[in-house]
C-alpha cells in the first residue's frame, strides 16, 4: 500500500484569516496568532513583578531589541524605577515680558465756548551786533636821567689808528635728514644699492672719503684683525629642524593610529587588495559599476551600490567584483614612510533564502609615491632697486662694416643714376627648394620649417633614418626568372620580396607513408 504524500500546511496567519469567521480554526493557530500560548502567558504574568526593559524577549525573532545584544561586562546597566534627572541651566533665566510703561501726560479738554483765535504779542528779536566797548589807556612816563658828559681823548701822534673788529659768532648749524615711508603690503622697496665715491642714492649708509695720503698721529699702527661682513636686513636663513618634520602637526595620536591600522591590515579577517587605477583616489564608484559622472556629488563618504542578485554585471575593474558597500577614504602612513589611501569595502557574494547577503570585507588601498626634495634655490625680492641693467636682443644685433664714405664705387664703371641698377639678376640659391628623402619604391616627403629672420637662412633636415640618393635616370630593375634543369623540381623565388623567405612547391613536400597495422 502506497503511503499518502504529506502536504505542508499553510502558514498560521493565512489560516487564521480564513477560518476565524467560520469558527473552524485549530487551537494551535489561535494560540499562536492571538499570543495565548503557555510561554506568552508566563511572560504576561511575570511582567507584573519583573521589568525586562527593551530587551525584546518574546516568541518572535531574537534581535536583541533596538540596540542589539550587549556582551556581558560591557555597556551601561539598566536602572529600574529610577527618577529621570532634570538638567537645570547654570544661569538664572530672565523673565521675558513687555518693557516698563512710560506714563503719557494728557491734555485738558478744550471747552466749546473757547475762542479759536490765537492772540499775537509784539516782541523784538535779539541784538546780534556787539555793543559799545569802553577803552581805558593810562600812560606812565619813565624816570628822567641827568645828561652825562663823555670825555673825548685826542692824540696827535704820527701812527695810524687800527681797529680790531671781531666777527659775531655764528651758531652751529644742525642738519636733520628724515625719510618717510608708507607701508604697502603689495609693494616693497629695496633701499640698498652700491654707493660710489661722493655719490649716494637710495642707500641708508653715506660714505665720506677724503684724499689719499696723510700722517698717523699717536702710537704704533694697530693690528689688523679679520672682520665679519654684517648681513643685510633683507637676507635671512631658514633653519631646518634635524631630523626634518614629517607632518605639519608634531603631536601624533599613536594609540588611534595603531588601533585603526590593526583593523584594516588584519589578513585573517580582511582581504587586502592593492589598487593601481588612479580613479580610486577621485572617482572610486567608476571602478564598481558603469555610471555617469555627477560633478555635484562628492565621493568622500560611504557609498552603497544596489544591484539585483539575479542580474550579473561585469564591473570595470575585476578587483571590485560583487562590492556592495565602499567606505570613506582613510589616510595612514606605511612603514616605508609613504602615504596610503584606504577604503573598507563589503562584498555580497552569498545570498540566503531569507534575503540576507553575506560577503567578506575587503581592504582596498593605494600607496602614493614620495615627493623627492630638490636643492633650494636662491630667490630675489621683487621691487625697485638701483643697479646696472643690460638688455640683450639677439635678432636686432647690428653689424659694423668699415667703408669709406668719400669713395663712390659706382662712379668707375657707369653713372650712379643708370638704369642698369633696376635690372634684377636671378640668383639660384635654392631658397625655396624641397628636400625629398626616400627611394623609388617608398617615397616619404618631409616638410622643412622656414623661419623668417634678419640673419642668414638656416635649414633643418630630419636625421632619424638613412639617406637614399635618387639619381635622375631610369633603370630596368626587372629580372628574368632563371629556371633550373628539367631533372629538378621547379622552385619559384620572388625577387621583389625583401623579407628573405620563400614558398616551397607542393611537390617538394615530404610524403608521409601510411602505416598499416596487421592483426
UniProtKB/Swiss-Prot annotation:
Which residue intervals are annotated with compositional bias (Polar residues) in the record?
Answer: 150-159
GO BP, one example? microtubule-dependent intracellular transport of viral material towards nucleus
What is the residue range of the motif Nuclear localization signal? 1-10, 510-518
- This chain's source organism reads Human papillomavirus 14
UniProt protein name: Minor capsid protein L2
Keyword list (alphabetical) reads: Capsid protein, Cytoplasmic inwards viral transport, Disulfide bond, DNA-binding, Host endosome, Host Golgi apparatus, Host nucleus, Host-virus interaction, Late protein, Microtubular inwards viral transport, Phosphoprotein, Viral penetration into host nucleus, Virion, Virus entry into host cell
Cellular localisation:
Virion; Host nucleus; Host early endosome; Host Golgi apparatus
For this protein, the record's InterPro entries field holds: Late_L2
Q: A single GO CC term, please?
A: host cell Golgi apparatus
Q: What does this protein do?
A: Minor protein of the capsid that localizes along the inner surface of the virion, within the central cavities beneath the L1 pentamers. Plays a role in capsid stabilization through interaction with the major capsid protein L1. Once the virion enters the host cell, L2 escorts the genomic DNA into the nucleus by promoting escape from the endosomal compartments and traffic through the host Golgi network.
List the Pfam families hit by this protein, alphabetically: Late_protein_L2
Highest taxon of the lineage: Viruses
Signal sequence residues: none
Query: Which residues form each disulfide bond in the chain?
Result: 19-25
Region annotated Disordered sits at 137-175
The Swiss-Prot or TrEMBL record describes its family as follows:
Belongs to the papillomaviridae L2 protein family.
For this chain, one GO molecular function annotation is:
structural molecule activity
User: Quaternary structure per UniProt?
Assistant: Interacts with major capsid protein L1. Interacts with E2; this interaction inhibits E2 transcriptional activity but not the DNA replication function E2. Interacts with host GADD45GIP1. Interacts with host HSPA8; this interaction is required for L2 nuclear translocation. Interacts with host importins KPNB2 and KPNB3. Forms a complex with importin alpha2-beta1 heterodimers via interaction with the importin alpha2 adapter. Interacts with host DYNLT1; this interaction is essential for virus intracellular transport during entry.
Q: What post-translational modification does the entry describe?
A: Highly phosphorylated.
